[in-house]
Amino acid sequence: MAIQTQLPCDGDGVCMRCQVTPPSEETLTCGTCVTPWHVSCLLPESLASSTGDWECPDCSGVVVPSAAPGTGISGPESSGSVLVAAIRAIQADVTLTEAEKAKKRQRLMSGGGDDGVDDEEKKKLEIFCSICIQLPERPVTTPCGHNFCLKCFEKWAVGQGKLTCMICRSKIPRHVAKNPRINLALVSAIRLANVTKCSGEATAAKVHHIIRNQDRPDKAFTTERAVKTGKANAASGKFFVTIPRDHFGPIPAANDVTRNQGVLVGESWEDRQECRQWGVHFPHVAGIAGQAAVGAQSVALSGGYDDDEDHGEWFLYTGSGGRDLSGNKRVNKIQSSDQAFKNMNEALRLSCKMGYPVRVVRSWKEKRSAYAPAEGVRYDGVYRIEKCWSNVGVQGLHKMCRYLFVRCDNEPAPWTSDEHGDRPRPLPDVPELENATDLFVRKESPSWGFDEAEGRWKWMKSPPVSRMALDTEERKKNKRAKKGNNAMKARLLKEFSCQICRKVLSLPVTTPCAHNFCKACLEAKFAGITQLRDRSNGVRKLRAKKNIMTCPCCTTDLSEFLQNPQVNREMMEIIENFKKSEEEAEVAESSNISEEEEEESEPPTKKIKMDNNSVGDTSLSA
């Protein structure tokens, strides 16, 4: 018996068996793979369908004897049945859109799949040549918005003389086919993908010596690599609490895994290194711990500024910055510029605005205060910032950021004999407010307040959610990865900029001269200009003249292209993905503590220029 092969219609609607273009009423569309078939070329056995939607011979899984070779495998054991089952599973997935279902069906029909494609390959598949289905080499973008390799495009348009896009069948202008232009924005995207992969492999091969928290000693330690004696180059000891670095308020017993009592008011430590091991104040040099976009979690009173006034239950605190720390200086008592509400100062102002509790530690270095401990560092409870302002400091030259802290803790202060904690108290009079500028007073209800019914301080609003990973090694790994990729992503977004508005492309269109513009910007550039200009003057009628619409970047005429400019969808998806990753990176970056953390794996061996956020410490041992 002769084998009768059944074939569907191609992309142009031509039957692949009889080479005739049938009318729509003489075609059947498969309900599974959405492929048109010529009814006259189908065998009668294939036209019978037991379900409501007709299925083509390829999807039905039923092999017609007259249409199959004698050695074929039929029935549900055939590979076609597996393919049909996979397609039906895609169709039944309610979480997918119609476009996503179509992509998955096409990938299955072409012999590909998701399981064998890793994340890097998936990223590359966002940009591919529509002919060779590979990363385009010297990419060319047609006016219809599809991308090709330069060689593939020349072979298609010049070698074979086909002036229609193989994807959408749109007409390709002759001047584009004759002189295609390389899309430099796509070149940058492909280069970034390749460089990112290479840098990722190189980073993975690098060995990092990491000491996990459970393997650390109980106290700060040094190694033979330490340049200075004492604790100047010491690494941190073991952390005894499980709070993240952006934790607000007291440290509860649930986070004290060793004692199950939390950190109590009045606890003291030998130095700032031990203090940070209990999570009360993490920076071992800087006086403010916080993030400008999140708030300040803790401050240290250690005599860094002569402007500070300590009255126990309330104190006036001075912000950071305004001092020259160049030349590897750690401390400079001379104020050389004005302080501004940014970085750590902005973090304190945000805590004032939101009414967050701020942990306060006092150091023995504060010699002018009657409430400072005689030795070491002591935790004195949580305070709330009620006001902040700017005023000229005691040196009389530059403005300082000033803050009014008022105690609001459920435990009594270490210098009192009370058995209960604080109660709401009136704000003290501050004489320097008469000459203050940039005064800010919180008007809305604070997040940390006093509950009259329960008689204690508590969170009146939900506390801020932590944005930082608890695991130190995981945090450092993410930091290294973001540091390597942020510069490349910023460069890529710069490459994907509109040549008119100079912003990141929105609905990008690629002109025949390979320049990229926002669709709205390009249309607005030529708004009100018609394709033809009427030259009749009332006396005699002349032929209409074509208006030349010159590209904003070159002398190419875009009049034909502007009749129906098509958005480059692949480029738009790439831009959206990178913008999303940039936003995630910015959110993660804003949650990082701005003070530089010491290298917890090994002590540093080179000099480090301290940031102006360092306040008042003359040694690491507080």
UniProtKB/Swiss-Prot annotation:
In what residue span(s) does the YDG domain sit? Answer: 258-407
Q: Where is this region: Disordered?
A: 579-622
Leading EC class:
transferase
Q: Name one GO cellular component term.
A: nucleus
Keyword tags: Chromatin regulator, Coiled coil, DNA-binding, Metal-binding, Nucleus, Repeat, Transferase, Ubl conjugation pathway, Zinc, Zinc-finger
Domain comment (free text): The RING fingers are required for ubiquitin ligase activity. The YDG domain mediates the interaction with histone H3.
Give the GO terms filed under biological process for this record: chromatin organization; protein ubiquitination
Q: Which SUPFAM superfamilies match?
A: FYVE/PHD zinc finger, PUA domain-like, RING/U-box
What are the residue ranges of zinc fingers typed PHD-type? 12-62
Q: Which residues form a coiled coil?
A: 566-602
Q: Which organism is it from?
A: Arabidopsis thaliana (Mouse-ear cress)
Q: What pathway does this protein act in?
A: Protein modification; protein ubiquitination
Q: What is this protein called?
A: Putative E3 ubiquitin-protein ligase ORTHRUS 4
Give me the stretches of Polar residues compositional bias: 611-622
Note whether Amino-acid biosynthesis occurs among the keywords. Answer: no
